[in-house]
Amino acid sequence: MNTATQASVSLTPEFIAATEKEITPHWGELGWVTYKRTYARWLPEQQRNEEWPETVKRVVEGNINLDPRLQADTVTPEVLTELTTEAQNLFRLIYGLAATPSGRNLWISGTDYQHRNGDALNNCWFIAVRPQAYGDSHILPSYLTQDQVAVSMPFSFMFDQLMKGGGVGFSVTPNNVHQMPVVDQTVDLTIVIDPESASYADSVALGAVNRSEWMHDNSLADVRFYRLPDTREGWVLANANMMDAHFNSTNPEKKTKVVLDISDIRPKNAPIHGFGGTASGPMPLVEMLFDINQILNNAVGRQLTAVDCTDMGNMIGKTVVAGNVRRSAELALGGAEDDAFITMKQDKDQLYHHRWASNNSVAVDSDFTDYAPIADSIQHNGEPGIVNLGLSRNYGRLIDGRQEGIDEAVEGTNPCGEISLSNGEPCNLFEVFPSVAEEQGWQLEDAFGLGARYTKRVTFSHYDWEVSRKAIQKNRRIGVSMSGIQDWILKTFKQRVVTGFEAKHDAETGKTFMQPIYNQAAVNRFNALYQAVVKADQDYSDTLGCQPSIKHTTVKPSGTVAKLAGVSEGMHFHYARYLIQRIRFQDSDPLLPALKASGYKVEPDVYSQNTMCVEFPVKAAHADEPAFASAGEVSMAEQFATQAFLQTYWSDNAVSCTVTFQPEEGQDISDLLLQYRHTIKSTSLLPYSGADFKQAPKEPIDAATYDAKCQEITADVAEKFAAMTGNHDQKDIELVDQSDCESGACPIR
């Protein structure tokens, strides 16, 4: 639990009212609707969701009060004045949508959930799948000591963080899975449930048995028995109990029977307090426990493989989705020469059952050159992605040269690949929209500096897992990002950042590659902004007496957050110059009448019952300028070159990028991966998909169609909703089938 502050900073109603008059939020075409259904929290006393100023106030106050100086016995007036001014600046910045913290912070910061759960403000995590000790953590199985290693630990970490709404990258590279012990014994798993439970019939249908009858016929003397409390931790510990029973080191009595009692788990549709939403009942957990136990039983007498470990991780992810977190973001990182791992999604039955739950990537270093089989798999399946651990461990920005071991503990990334992470470490994100910030009168150095300080404060949260606390205290890693990059480059430099290519011989491979030429003014500006972030972090670290951050900058994929401000997503190019963006709503959503009354096209979804599809016409920024290029027009080579530019001059962490390619470009994937092996820390590729099916999420249109669609919109939906409902809303209504990034890998909030 977070330590209560001795003094606190708050924003006055007078300040907020004055800011509302002074600044107009830069809502994108879908911005307000996306906000209302994603980040506006329910206010039970008023029977409505938050309005934007209330959300920003909550978020800013939740962050500014993490400053450790506020926990001192005596807090000076100077500190309170300094932090109040900073809170006001942050409010102006975020309220205007010139910048935002991560979607996770928009949803959680300033809530009771933040104070109860130390991990709450971090989007994503990384864990190495090898036997580890639980340490001084909020979860510790009763049969273990803190320093006793257990096979279950990385899976418990993964399960816990996914249920708290985070995403998890996990490594099943050979050096990790080879540390797994041989599976010693089969386990006879029994799941019992009270016949009075509302979940009884559904659970029995999945293999659970009547608790009263089982207890009458059996003794607990020779079994490992665990009665699950109705908590997140109970689900985690049930799985740990079953997993660890397979190994003599964590089951020295060699008991082969495990009995798990799920009678106390709340039934389906009961409210989940804290994170929000409603419960699934125990049924997804029952299915998962039997499935994971079967994998372990099948492995008796041998070590677990990367595929086994990924399957178990995917089954956990599947359970969390069914458990009503809505999405669980996973990235499995395997060996570049592990054919079984690389091809595991080709088994369609397993893919549809659980292997869909992770994006899969392979770990390489710059000496790796055999990209042909990987490129072939990418061309046909869009996977695996590439993560260059050697670059991540020894480089910040590429322009700063090799810095041996600067980040030597890195073992993987978060699911979207923009932050290289050590074992147990989270990403910690904030992004600035440079075009919007400049329009609203901000000096970009100041905006990025506020982002550095915001993320630095998050590192002073109290973290639930010892492995995370150690990594954060050592690294204080932050990830200040920018989004709308293509918009800002076109607006500022009047051309795209890649101005051409020139042939260059690669002595290592004997090949000739086309080396990109960059706009020098852009090089200089990105470099200056990077230095501003580093200076802001250094100055704040000096003030707080803590470690400067090991790395500072990144490019996150964005998506939902970029929609708020209506900017291009991360470094990605706009999907099209003009398009129809379709958003799906639950058919009971109170926003739908307001959308229809405002002139938006609303129709039943052709794929899902109880769902309505709404069309929003969207025009890309600078769509009519000669230098504009959409994702369907820009070459794969230019996308690689743009990612390399950002890795060289801006990001000392990594750059999240999903490179899209046309069918005729597939043959070039291998050579481009080879060309940029010394430059790009992580990347993924997907075929560019047009809108060749009904109600596609994005459908390119021409300018005339866009203008006609806009003519049909006769009112502002926020004003119409207020007029029709008095802003009274309905609890737990979300958009259907959202994704927060190009690859669909991120949690939304």
UniProtKB/Swiss-Prot annotation:
Transmembrane segments: none annotated. Disulfide bonds join C124-C427. Its EC number is 1.17.4.2. Residues 573-634 are annotated as: Adenosylcobalamin-binding-1. Its cofactor is adenosylcob(III)alamin. It catalyses: a 2'-deoxyribonucleoside 5'-triphosphate + [thioredoxin]-disulfide + H2O = a ribonucleoside 5'-triphosphate + [thioredoxin]-dithiol. Keywords: Allosteric enzyme, Cobalamin, Cobalt, Disulfide bond, DNA replication, Oxidoreductase, Redox-active center. GO terms for molecular function: cobalamin binding; nucleotide binding; ribonucleoside-diphosphate reductase activity, thioredoxin disulfide as acceptor; ribonucleoside-triphosphate reductase (thioredoxin) activity. Residues 152-163 are annotated as: Effector region-1. The keyword Disulfide bond applies. Residues 693-734 are annotated as: Adenosylcobalamin-binding-2. Residues 173-321 are annotated as: Effector region-2. Pfam families: RNR-II_ins_dom, RNR_Alpha. GO terms for biological process: DNA replication. The active site is at C416, E418. Allosterically regulated by ATP and dNTP. The keyword Nucleus does not apply. Belongs to the class II ribonucleoside-triphosphate reductase family. Monomer. This is Adenosylcobalamin-dependent ribonucleoside-triphosphate reductase. The lineage of its organism: Bacteria, Bacillati, Bacillota, Bacilli, Lactobacillales.
